[in-house]
Amino acid sequence: SLRRRQRQMCIRDRKDTYPGFEGTFNYQQRMPIVDLPVSMDNLLSNVTAVVVTHTHLDHWDDTAIKSIPKSLPIFVQNTADKELIISQGFNDVRIIFESLEFNGITLRKTGGSHGTVEMYANPVLAPLAGDAMGVIFEAEGEPTVYLVGDTVWTSDVEKALLRFDPNVIIMNTGYAQILGFEDSIIMGTKDIGRMVVRKPEAKIIAVHMDTVNHTATSREDVRKFIKGNNIEIHVAVPEDGETITL
């Protein structure tokens, strides 16, 4: 149930199926770096819908396309992603324009930026970075969950924190990097520290590490950071396949 438990897991091909992303940090490393920690049947057994924040290979790949039942509701950010996923055989693809309801849960789209202003000014990199949404999950009597998505810290993130006041914040903190750019295309440890200061009453869940080649920050790095800053009570760093009860 989206209300009671949060499992953050992409359905990916077997370990080393794909070459690393060209032009990124550690590009020689094939990916996924790990296999799925649970069987596909177990993973999908209680899934009632899938949220695809964007369709980059590390979020939506051939195994996801082949394994997810084609009748399962898929929630996406825009028309382009909807058309792509329909072309892959799925027949219930819904765009979160602003918000929608599903099984007593309200899903609200939030904005972000999959890289810095400098990166989006690059005519080659900008279309590759593309768009990536975040999602707010709200349900009666349940904590409000903010899935930040693949973004750096932007005014859209600030607006979401102010507007929705989330109780649980899921942050992609692998600090994925493009060669030739000092900054990252997603968040990292400094953003965790910033979030703790910004929302000290929220539970932060740090994910999107140790599975794809271009993430420069590992779980070990994050754990060292939170321990060194005495913020263990605020931040959880789940293992692959771990389910966190909210």
Where is each model-derived feature located?
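Single conserved hydrophobic/aromatic residue that forms the stacking wall/gate
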Residues: S1-I11
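Active-site neighborhood of phospho(di)ester-bond hydrolases with catalytic His/Asp-centered motifs
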Residues: R12, N46-T55, F75-N78, V145-T151, ...
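Active-site-proximal loop/helix segment associated with metal-binding centers of metalloenzymes
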Residues: K15-Q29, K109-E142
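Active-site environment of divalent metal-dependent phosphoester hydrolases
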Residues: D16, T55-W60, K82-L84, L100-E101, ...
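Active-site metal-binding motif and surrounding structural segment of the metallo-beta-lactamase
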Residues: G23-V76, D92, D165-I170
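A short acidic, amphipathic alpha-helical/loop segment
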Residues: T63-S67, L84, Q88-G89, D156-A160, ...
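Beta-strand-turn-beta hairpins that frame and shape the catalytic cleft
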Residues: S99-R108, E138-V145, L246
